[in-house]
Amino acid sequence: MASTQAMGMTEQQKKSVDEMVEKATNMGVNVQAQNSAVVSMINQTNVSMTFNENHNWSGSVVGTGYPKSIPTKQSRQFIHQGDAKDGSQGAVVYYGSNANGEPCGWLLAWCAPTNVTPTKPNRVYVDCGAQSKFDTISWDTIKAKLDVGPATTNFTDVDTETTIAAGVTSTGSFASVGAAFGLST
């Protein structure tokens, strides 16, 4: 199974992630978010995506919870309230299909510390591919990858031709996380 954890995003991925970060920032400002990650995700596939699962290392979702679905070509948002010590650290998995109708999954993980420092920066980690890859997730492995992740990243699974790109930035009292779930074709 071939896959690529890429260092640089395509222009389209960067544009999409920047738009989602801006949406998250606007939402965070509107609700006066504190010590949280405001997450905005866009579905750039050709079918609706459904929420499969989440994992919280620190903090929890607030408000209406995780979006149950993300219709094609639309975005959805949620707020993950951090705890006072470690901030917001969590992950979500959404299921959908690739261009061939094969079941696929997209994973987004983020770390938005309470106090961002050079040694404790905001981070994201992403993964995608065949749905079976996400049947049993080692959350310890995901956390280890997140702990060394960058502030922006993207991933392409060449077997399923799926992609995911994400970025996180500090916005005063909260972090804005943007992600684009897509196809490489």
Swiss-Prot record:
The record's section on InterPro entries has: Jasmonate-induced_protein, Nakanori
Q: Which family, according to the similarity comment?
A: Belongs to the jasmonate-induced protein family.
Q: What is this protein called?
A: Jasmonate-induced protein homolog
Q: Which organism is it from?
A: Atriplex canescens (Fourwing saltbush)
